[in-house]
Amino acid sequence: MSATNTLQTNVYVDWNNDGDFDDLHDSITSDILEMSFQRGRDYASQLSGKSVAGKLTIRLENDTAKYSPDNSSSALFGSLLPGRKVQVRGVVGTYNTFPYTFPFTFNNLTETVIWTGYLDRITPMPSPHGVDTAEIVVFGVLGYLNDTYRS
């Protein structure tokens, strides 16, 4: 028996603004092509550096125009609005592997909120050659509180 540490990242958007992330399209994890974070201080110095809002940029697959605000046939039409709550969650823990198969598993995995922010903008990026994408920009709670999350 061996224990293995795991980490899987899941991203959720509360598209209908109902306070949960349980609705059909709230998980955007399967559409993510690329994701990057920026957070911390504008300078490394504690004396002159200022805290800045975290920023999450996600590039999503958008072949069906699901993330295109003008697409009236999208399941998310009317919900692709600034200010929607976004959560990044990590699935962390251990799982046990055995040299033979049981009809059940011995897992100790937990999904934990790693980061929370608010949607700033969605920019569809159609491509004449290849995959249509959309870029989502999200600012952290500090930016939301300072009202600087809006462009």
Where are these regions (language model features)?
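Assembly/oligomerization scaffold segments
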Residues: M1-S151
